[in-house]
Amino acid sequence: MKKIIKIRRFKFPFTKEKTINFASVRNKISYPDFLDIQIKSFTNFFCINYTYKNISNKGFYKVFIEYFPISDSKNKFIIDFISYKIYDPLYSIEECIKRGLTYNVYIRARFKIYRTRKRKITIENKRTKYFETIYQDVYFGTCPYMTPSGSFIFNGSERVIVSQLHRSPGVFFGQYDIPNLPKISYARIIPLKGSWIELSTDINNVMYIYLDIKKRLPITTLLRALGYTRDIDILNIFNLAEEVNINKVNYKKFLGRTLAARIFKTSYQKFEENDILLERNIKLKKYHIDIILYYKIKVISLYKKNEKNEKNLYYSIIHNTLKKDPTNSQKEANIYIYKELKDSFPKNDKKAKLFINKFFFDETHLGEVGRYKLNKTLKLDFPLKDQILNIEDIISIIENLIALCNNKKEVDDIDNLANRRVKTVGEQLYTQYTIGIARVSRIIKERINVKDNETLTPLELINSKTLTSVINSFFGTDELSQFMDQTNPLAEMTHKRRISSLGPGGLSRERAGFEIRDVNYSHYGRLCPIETPEGPNIGLISSLCVFAKINSMGFIETPYFKVKKGKVVINEAPIYISSDQEYGKLITQANAILNYKTGVLKNNIIVRVNADFPMVNYKKINYIDVSTNQIASISASLIPFLEHDDANRALMGSNMMRQSVPLLNPKAPIVGTGLEKHLAQYVNALIYAEGDGIVESVDANNIKVKYFNSEKEKLLSFEKRIKTYKLIKFRKTNQNTCLNIRPIVKKGMYVTKGQVLCEGFATQNGKLALGRNIKVAFMPFKGYNFEDAIVISEKVVREDWFTSIHIDEYSLEVRDTKLGMEEFTFDIPNFNEENKKKLDKYGIIKIGSEVKPGDVLIGRITPKKEGYPSSEENFLKAIFGKKVGTIKNTSLKADSSLFGVVIDTKIYSKFSSKEDEQKQFQIKKLNNKFMKNLKLLRKLLINKLILVLEGSVSEGILNSSYKEIIPKGKILNKLNLKKLLKNQEIIYQNWVNNKYKNNLVFKIIKFYYLKINELKIKLKRKKNRLLIGDEITSGIIKIAKVLIAKKRKLKVGDKMSGRHGNKGIVARIVKEEDMPYLEDGTSVDLVLNPLGVPSRMNLGQIYETILGWAGEKLGINFSTPIFDGASIEEISKYTDIANLPSFGNTYLFDGETGEKFDQPVTVGVIYMLKLNHMVDDKMHARSIGPYSLITQQPLGGKSKFGGQRLGEMEVWALEAFGAANILREILTVKSDDVKGRTKTYEAIVKRETIPNPGIPESFHVLLKELKGLGLSLKLEVIKKKEKKNQKIKVRIEIKEKDIIKYKKKVKEIKLKKLKELKEQLSKSNKKK
């Protein structure tokens, strides 16, 4: 089984770039593995790192245990699950991406089928024998397997399973208001499996239990059914009553006391046959006592002294509920509950009792989390294995609910993270496999009963197709299985750490209220309060904080250092605690430490206690944050000076960083936060040195490194000393951005362990680099930067600072049609020879060709229907002897906006019988190469063992058959080791009497077999590729793919942004000499509007601009962690060192006139990003296209080739200008005047005057809708002739006469129908 190997993460060596860190709080804790949320969950589900002993109740194994064993209806035969095995993927990750395949593993499960009793069976030759237990390995489908970067490859595209945040199983107490009435309290039991159960009081203080939403019962009825038969039993649960002995001597002391339970004539057990003497809740008087004594009743139930008080809700609720209880015994209660839930009477009491036990206890499965929450809320102490609801739970819930009614208990906050848990990828897969295996078990049950039992085998019973279809539909269509955002490394990482409240079993964006979307105090250090979408999903999709982890139960934890007696325990590891463990604890911020060496805190500190922020003495504090950026997610932690930005703009900044396009030449920011280095380690494409060594050779595609291995490493390793690393070149990402890696080391360079060897895909020197540092001036520029518009220098475009590469994929298929086979060909009919120059012999455009609109990308011909041949065709047929014109050109051509370069072409085809012999020869070649490699490995192994064992005394060496090949006591030498180990299968045991040597031998053999396994997998993959061919969907014979790279420079209309939510559109590209310039002649590269800063309250960009300028001048980088960044004094210090004006205020000169501007301008260096919202993708103009069927208006959007929306505000603008003719044209002919637009088209074609428009279709729709309401609307055009011109007035009237006529017609129709019916009935009666 192939393990998920995590991406290498090493510390970076010291680089030439000097970085100054402004952090006052130094992180004493390293960042956790950011991909743990995905990888750990998946490995736990498949039990990859577990031993067989620990596997029994975990993940995938648990799914089988839930549904197996399965028996037939007569319980004769049983099929049981034994174990499962997961096989390595057939294709590598790279192959799956290129070929459009799924990176999956094959699962085989071992089953046995046996008979419950021994019985002789007759076989074909009439001999008899006993039915033997059959063991079989069954193919159990495939499952997409997680890549080391935490994603899945499904049908060639990378996907992510987003974790879901949903309500935790357990019990929750709440209240809701009814106007002018007391509050209604309720307790809701939410199980892991089964229906919800709710206990609630009403306005009369009666407690009901709600089942299946609508069904409700008094709670005392349920208690009776559960064994608390008598009233006194129910009252004793809550300690409200006592049983007393009564006689003629002591009766006086009971006068005035209240009866707690009914009194019957004879024994309580036979009360159904007897009359009730006294009802409950009666104050005992002398004549009541006389009745009791007369019937010789010795024991009565009374309420305890001072308990009967109307304000006591304990008494009131139980007493009122008993009043409403229609039952008097357990039998009655059982029948009553059965009748309420099933709407029918049970056959007997036993059936009713079994149904109640199954409904409340067997089907209500709490799960481990539900039991934990119940224990925590109700202060119980049941083991976590006890995962079924019990009587004690119900009684405790009733007590807590009464306490809530009595204001002695707080209401639960359902939005608190203590009551919400995360469903990670492993748990979601577990849910899908339970659905799939449940279907498989149903099929097994059907087959085991139908088939001949005597010849049953597991292979005949089990069909894994149903399971595979469930898993594939989950990965392909589920709301939580999403197409991975791969725009840049940050977008990829954020997507993997995303937490969604939507999805199956979660919330819907339409119903989710403000409370659930709002920031909760429990989110601190767990869910980022900043990063969330801006649209309808705001607050429903969040991101994990930097240090947050998810525990085994699915609750989010965050780390804290302990504080003891006012001192931080820095030497100990921080503890991770969940929201419910944090409740009531005093926690302070990371910057509250006075002395970092001793850990002493400041005297009076503001702390956080739940949702409050009091100031307390330092000795009372329990915990302290581990870092200042603990509160934020990765994206928010990358924004320098975040503390100076408004939260809304910080949200936009963190979202827009994920939209930034990887540039051709990116640069790491001068002003960063320190997280850039750590995040770059998770870029899967980057390569780091595995040890110290020298670079042997470097080219664009490969880096070869020769490592210096120690003597021990040389002895153990079977790998070559020179390791070759392949670089990813121009790979298309999901968002069509370009993933291209280039080397940054040179031949002969010495590399150290952990050193980055390459860069690219938004990284530079091992740092995240999403954009460029650019010189900026905050000033107006002739109105061109009005409303956030951006003015840039021509130099930026010329030097390709913001140039990016985008890759588009075009494909064409060849099918076998009814008329014949389609074909990829160079010989395209009616096509110029010049245009064919770019095509290869298969008709596919050559790699390196420049593509222009109209160029053929893939040449294809398709057979077409034959008509009657013309005389010319007959003539050509007679000359050339073949049919002409029976094919048509169906080639793929470049569209009107496509300009680029072909970077790759591929043809995928199914296996053909002609290639069989060639393939067999290649397989032989592969087998021979594999055997050679095995022999070499064997020689290497023997040499290594000789080196270790020569001269040692043998302890008895065995082969794989456990036969002794070297006897005990024999001295080992070269000859006997070579002879005996040459052809023997080696197993490990204690070979010699030396522990150290035995350990070395064990490791050598282990690495030997690992290497063999690696070679076997490679051989299997290569053979598979040859035998199976390319995996193509049925009906398709060949697929040709062409990848075209487009180089996009920065244009007017492209969207840009900073890291502080300061976004804008490029409005004008100005010549470098016309841009404002500094006193030394340096022109600025970017001009931003200063009015975009104060109203948006994102001053962080100003701080960054000033410090960035100082960094550029001094040639140093700065690290300013969030909430612990550089102060104004520290920034001023570096601007003074760089001889720059304070706060960047400097006088600029006009580039066109050379005149000095009147006012000083803020100038500096800011980090800008180019976003994936480019004008080339947005520009669109409609000529002809589809219309809406109802309104007859053009559709909207570029994908539908729609028109531009002209709303009411645009109409006002045209009205204000008095552009009546344009307005009329837009509202009629260009919109929904069906007849008018055809006439207009005809007039344009015929070059005639455009006719007057007719009535828009939207008006006809209005008429139809009014008719639907029974209103008849008519248009009357009145023409009045005057002296000079003719005026036309339009009068619209709704006439009541028409409505009356309509109603009369309806009545007449009804009367006619009635008459017809009467006539038919009279005729039928006459016949009878």
Swiss-Prot record:
Keyword Oxidoreductase: no
Cellular component, GO, one term: DNA-directed RNA polymerase complex
Chain segments annotated as coiled-coil in the UniProt record: none
Catalytic reaction annotation: RNA(n) + a ribonucleoside 5'-triphosphate = RNA(n+1) + diphosphate
Gene Ontology molecular functions: DNA binding; DNA-directed RNA polymerase activity; ribonucleoside binding
Entry-linked SUPFAM superfamilies: beta and beta-prime subunits of DNA dependent RNA-polymerase (SSF64484)
Function per UniProt: DNA-dependent RNA polymerase catalyzes the transcription of DNA into RNA using the four ribonucleoside triphosphates as substrates.
Summary of subunit composition and partner proteins: The RNAP catalytic core consists of 2 alpha, 1 beta, 1 beta' and 1 omega subunit. When a sigma factor is associated with the core the holoenzyme is formed, which can initiate transcription.
Family: Belongs to the RNA polymerase beta chain family.
Protein name: DNA-directed RNA polymerase subunit beta
